[in-house]
């Protein structure tokens, strides 16, 4: 159930499940993940052009000057951004809080925004399980405490607690709510 030019926007703190949920939306429902651009180092099992477009900070700065981004931000010392070329029909995008604020401020009914929340303990465990060092995990948690303070989270269409859910359950809930929203829009 799709309308043209719709988008799912997923955000949340580090290791809240947003990237894995986006992958599940692709494999199970055919929602293509918009590939964002970043300057952060590639993790084990990540592939350039599949998970992110990995570029140098210099190239990212050039892309900003060339006005190639819908939104971009500096997060944990690395740049992240959504290029205009990656925004298309029926895509999902995983973004940080500033990107979420940018999309939320558009007030476009076709952009369905989600915030995934999970406890710090679970997120810390997930970070270690995916190969982050303890020091990096601690730094990310500390940074997230500042960034994701409750007053900083913009209005979103839906908040999902991903704490005790599998990635498939989170993706199913995102898809169900997305379809519900699209149905309401098409009936209005």
Predicted regions mapped to residue ranges:
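Phosphate-binding P-loop
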Residues: 1-5
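Hydrophobic anchor at the beta1->P-loop junction of P-loop NTPases
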Residues: 10
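P-loop (Walker A) phosphate-binding loop of NTP-binding proteins
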Residues: 13
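Walker A/P-loop
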Residues: 18-19
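Post-Walker A helix-loop "phosphate-sensing" segment adjacent to the P-loop in P-loop NTPases
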Residues: 27-35
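ATP-dependent small-molecule kinase phosphotransfer cores
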Residues: 38-91, 95-98
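Conserved phosphate-donor/acceptor-positioning beta-strand/loop module used by diverse small-molecule
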Residues: 92-96, 107-128
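Small-molecule kinase domains that catalyze NTP-dependent phosphoryl transfer to phosphate-bearing small molecules
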Residues: 132-179, 188
């Amino acid at each position: 159930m799709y309308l043209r030019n719709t988008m799912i926007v997923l955000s949340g703190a580090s290791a809240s499940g947003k990237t894995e949920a986006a992958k599940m939306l692709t494999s199970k429902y055919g929602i293509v993940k918009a590939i964002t651009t970043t300057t952060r180092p590639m993790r084990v099992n990540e592939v350039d052009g599949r998970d992110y477009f990995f570029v140098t900070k210099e190239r990212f700065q050039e892309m900003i000057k060339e006005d190639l981004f819908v939104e971009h931000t500096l997060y944990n010392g690395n740049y992240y951004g959504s290029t205009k070329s990656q925004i298309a029909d029926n895509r999902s995008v995983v973004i940080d809080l500033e990107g979420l604020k940018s999309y939320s401020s558009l007030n476009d009914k076709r952009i369905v925004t989600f915030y995934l929340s999970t406890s710090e303990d679970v997120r810390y465990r997930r970070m270690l399980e995916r190969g982050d060092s303890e020091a990096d995990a601690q730094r990310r948690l500390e940074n997230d405490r500042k960034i994701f303070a409750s007053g900083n989270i913009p209005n979103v269409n839906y908040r999902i607690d991903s704490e005790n859910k599998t990635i498939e359950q989170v993706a199913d809930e995102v898809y169900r709510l997305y379809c519900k929203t699209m149905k309401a829009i098409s009936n209005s």
